[in-house]
Regions:
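Functional beta-strand-loop-alpha-helix junction segments that form "active/interaction loops"
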Residues: 196-236
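Structural motif
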Residues: 43, 213-215, 251-255, 298
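Gly/Ser/Thr-rich active-site loops/lids in small-molecule metabolic enzymes
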Residues: 270-288, 317-328, 332
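N-terminal catalytic scaffold of extracellular/periplasmic and nuclease hydrolases
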Residues: 24-180, 184-202, 206-210, 304-383
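Active-site His/acidic residue clusters
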Residues: 145-151, 218-226, 236-240, 244-286
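Metal-dependent active-site segment of extracytoplasmic phospho-/sulfohydrolases and closely related
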Residues: 51, 276-314
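Sec-dependent N-terminal signal peptides of Gram-positive bacterial secreted proteins and lipoproteins
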Residues: 3-25
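Short coil/turn segments at beta-strand junctions that form active-site/ligand-binding loops
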Residues: 39-40, 132, 248-249, 293-295
Length: 383
C-alpha cells in the first residue's frame, strides 16, 4: 500500500515543485561579479542586534566597538518568506542557507518543510564538502535557532530531539553552547565527539578531534560567570585555535544570543553587557584575521529585537518586547568587494557572497539538494 501511495505522490510532488519554481522564480543575481578570495571565514551573528543596540551599549557602558572600526559597513534586510518581521529560525536559515523560509522552520524550504523533495544546503555543509574545518559557537543552547540553522534541517525550531540528533550525527568539528535537552556524554562519545562541560576541559582540547560542549548558561557575560564557564570571547579564541589546523581553511559561526534574550525582557544592563561581550568576540576574530591575512569576517544580525528608539533627551529606550522589521548592521573585514560602504543587502545574499569569497561558484549557494526519488522522476521524465 505504501508503495502505491509513493508512486502516486512522487510525480505529483515533483510537478508541484516545478510549478512553484515558475511562480516564485529565482531572484536576479545580487552577488558581485568579482569577489576577493579568502581561505577562512568567521561569521559573527548578534541575535536581535539592531543599529541602536550598538548606540545604547556605547552610551550606557561608555565603550567603543571594534566592529565599527571595520572599513566596510552596510545594512541587511531581514524579512522572512511571508512576514515582514522574521523570527530567529527563519533568520538563521536565510543567513546560513541563502533562502527565505517560514518563521519557525529551520534549514528547509518553505514549500517543503519535511524535506520530501529537497533541502537547501547550509554554509557549514558546503564548507565540509570542500574539506574545510567547521565550528559553531553560541551563548544559546546548542539546539537554539541560530546554531540549528547552520547544522540541521527540520520543520520546527522546537524539535529539540531531532536537532540534537542531527547535530550529533553531523561532520561539524566543534559545536559549543549551553546545555540542550538530549545531549549527553554517552551520546556525544558514541558519535565521535569529545564531550566538554567546563572551561578547563575546553582549554585542554587539542587539534585534530571533534568536540561538543554543554556549558552553563552564563557564557554571555563580559567576565567569567564562574571558574568553569567560559565567556563567548574565550570560546571564540579556543575555537579558532582548534580550527586553524588545515590547509583547506575553516568556517566558524559565532552567535551572541543574549542581545536578543535581554532585549525581549527590555533589560538594559543585560543587553548592553551582551553587546560588549559579543564585540569582545569580534575583537578576537579581528586579531586573528589581521595576523592571518587570508580571513573574511562578517558581522551581522538575524533581526532587531525591542524596537529601540532615540529619545528627545539623547538616550535610547526599548519600545516593545518582540522583534521588529528594522534593518540590521552589517560589518565586513578582509574583503574590498564583499559590500560597498552603505550598501543595503538582503539577508539571503550574505551567505551567497561568503560562498563566492571561498571560491565556490554562484550556483553553489543557494543550492537545492534533491531527494533521490526526485532525481529518478526527473530522469524518467527526461527520457
Amino acid at each position: 500500500m505504501l508503495y502505491i501511495i509513493r508512486q502516486i505522490l512522487q510525480p505529483l510532488l515533483a510537478m508541484i515543485m516545478s510549478l512553484n519554481m515558475m511562480i516564485f522564480p529565482v531572484t536576479e543575481d545580487r552577488v558581485p561579479e568579482e569577489m576577493d578570495q579568502v581561505q577562512n571565514v568567521i561569521y559573527l551573528i548578534g541575535d536581535g542586534m539592531g543599529p541602536l543596540h550598538l548606540e545604547k551599549a556605547k552610551q550606557e557602558r561608555n565603550i567603543s566597538l571594534v566592529m565599527e572600526t571595520f572599513e566596510y559597513s552596510g545594512r541587511s534586510m531581514t524579512r522572512s518568506q511571508f512576514n515582514a518581521v522574521t523570527d530567529s529560525a527563519a533568520g538563521a536559515t536565510a543567513l546560513a542557507c541563502g533562502v527565505r523560509t517560514i518563521n519557525g522552520y529551520v534549514g528547509v524550504f518553505y514549500y517543503d518543510p519535511l524535506c520530501v523533495e529537497s533541502t537547501p544546503r547550509n554554509l557549514t555543509e558546503l564548507c565540509i564538502e570542500k574539506g574545510m574545518m567547521t565550528g559553531i559557537v553560541t551563548t544559546d543552547k546548542t539546539s537554539g535557532a541560530t546554531p540549528s540553522g547552520f547544522s540541521v534541517h527540520t520543520d520546527s525550531r522546537n524539535n529539540t530531539k531531532d536537532i540534537d540528533t542531527q547535530q550529533m550525527n553531523s561532520d561539524i568539528d566543534l559545536i559549543w553552547g549551553a546545555t540542550s535537552s538530549y545531549i549527553s556524554q554517552e551520546t556525544c562519545e558514541a558519535n565521535g565527539f569529545t564531550f566538554v562541560k567546563t572551561y578547563s576541559e575546553m582549554m585542554a582540547l587539542e587539534e585534530g578531534g571533534c568536540s561538543f560542549a554543554q556549558f552553563d548558561n552564563g557564557t554571555w557575560y563580559t567576565e567569567q560567570y564562574d571558574d568553569e564557564t567560559p565567556t563567548l570571547s574565550q570560546m571564540t579564541t579556543k575555537a579558532i585555535d582548534l580550527l586553524d589546523d588545515t590547509d583547506e581553511g575553516f568556517f566558524l559561526m559565532v552567535e551572541g544570543a543574549h542581545i536578543d534574550k535581554n532585549s525581549h525582557d527590555n533589560e538594559d544592563a543585560g543587553m548592553t553587557e551582551a553587546v560588549e561581550e559579543f564585540d569582545n568576540a569580534v575583537a578576537v576574530a579581528l586579531e586573528y584575521a589581521k595576523n592571518d591575512g587570508n580571513t573574511l569576517i562578517v558581522v551581522t544580525a538575524d533581526h532587531e529585537t525591542g524596537g529601540i528608539v532615540l529619545n528627545d533627551d539623547g538616550t535610547y529606550s526599548f519600545t516593545q518586547g518582540s522583534h521588529s522589521g528594522a534593518n540590521v548592521p552589517l560589518f565586513v573585514y578582509g574583503s574590498d568587494t564583499f559590500i560597498e560602504n552603505g550598501e543595503v543587502v538582503y539577508n539571503i545574499d550574505i551567505p551567497a557572497r561568503i560562498a563566492y569569497s571561498l571560491g565556490f561558484d554562484k550556483d553553489d549557494m543557494p543550492y537545492e539538494r534533491f531527494a533521490d526519488w526526485v532525481n529518478v522522476v526527473v530522469e524518467n521524465v527526461a527520457k
